[in-house]
Amino acid sequence: MAAAIALRQRGADVLVADALRPPIDKPCGEGLMPDSRRELARLGVNMDDRLGARFSGILFADGDARVRAEFPHGAGIGVRRPVLHHLLLDRATELGVRMAWNAPVVMKEQNAALVGGERCGFRWLVGADGHASRVRAWAGLDAANLRSRRFGFRAHFCIAPWSSYVEIHWGAQGQVYVTPVGPHEICVAAISRRSDVRLKAVIDSIPFLRNKLAGAQVSSAERGALTLTRRLHRVTRGNVALVGDASGSADAITGEGLAMGFRQALLLAESLGQGGLHLYESRHGSILALPQQMATMMLLLDRHAWLRRRALLVLAARPELFRAMLAVHVGEASLPRFLAQHGLQFGALLLAPQFA
């Protein structure tokens, strides 16, 4: 939907076709970082805090090792995915985007497809159909480097948020992300390397969360999804372009999936405004670069409990380092500059005996 909005803002005639019907819900952590909100504003969608729950920063926890930091500027918002989809749908309708729901798409030829059983011609085809993209397969764009693969599960609980942060907790079975999404509701998402683990098992492996959520009513059915770090060799071919998870992704630990999709949508519209897909192909990788680099670093902590605990103890003792890392994460500082200014110090502290 973001791609349709971005293209329509530049005057394109756009048809969105989907086999589902709104409201469309997809499993995710439901936290929009400040940079995500800025990209949404460029699409004409302004997120009122009353639509969800405001959060001021990020907290990491592993047992009694905890560190937190606030965003350098602005705040994030936790919002239920159907609410976000409804806002995007309203914006697309306002702009005059045409829509076909309950309309499966069957690719037929380079400039036409069957949409709900009827032939539909097009000049450009945008595949925004997720990790298992059929458009990607049809266009011969499946070649990719898969760097990580984990399993995610999400549910909502009727309980007032106890924190103004998005909290990431590590346990023996995986990670749990707690995002406030309303005055009396939180989103709880778990990610594990094990396919046989479910949300409750991961929560129960973290005493703090097990105690917090004891007796809390579950307000949504548990849903699952894969989370991948994947880079495609190409994201365009001929008159076909891929956006969102169809075009590659970073592990959900980054919380940047939606922001990347919004940036890609805006870049695609700019590229087609110049008459083709060259700009999109050439710059798409730069949108994925930082989230994938951050995912690599954070997944290293996920793999090695001893390193994770040391890192959290160091960051708790030097909170300015965590603030600087968060600034990099939300695009307000550069990773090379952070490494140049703080890399040696952080490495030395990791080796210091007091953090063993």
PLM regions and their residue ranges:
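Glycine-rich FAD pyrophosphate-binding loop
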Residues: 5-28
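Generic enzyme active-site microenvironment
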Residues: 16-17, 127, 243, 249
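N-terminal FAD cofactor-binding segment of flavoenzymes
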Residues: 25-59
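Conserved N-terminal helical subregion
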Residues: 38, 52-138, 144-150, 350
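Conserved FAD-binding catalytic core of PHBH/FMO-like flavoproteins
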Residues: 128-209
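FAD/FMN-dependent oxidoreductases across multiple families
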Residues: 194-270, 277-278
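C-terminal helical "tail/cap" subdomain of flavin- and related membrane-associated enzymes
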Residues: 270-356
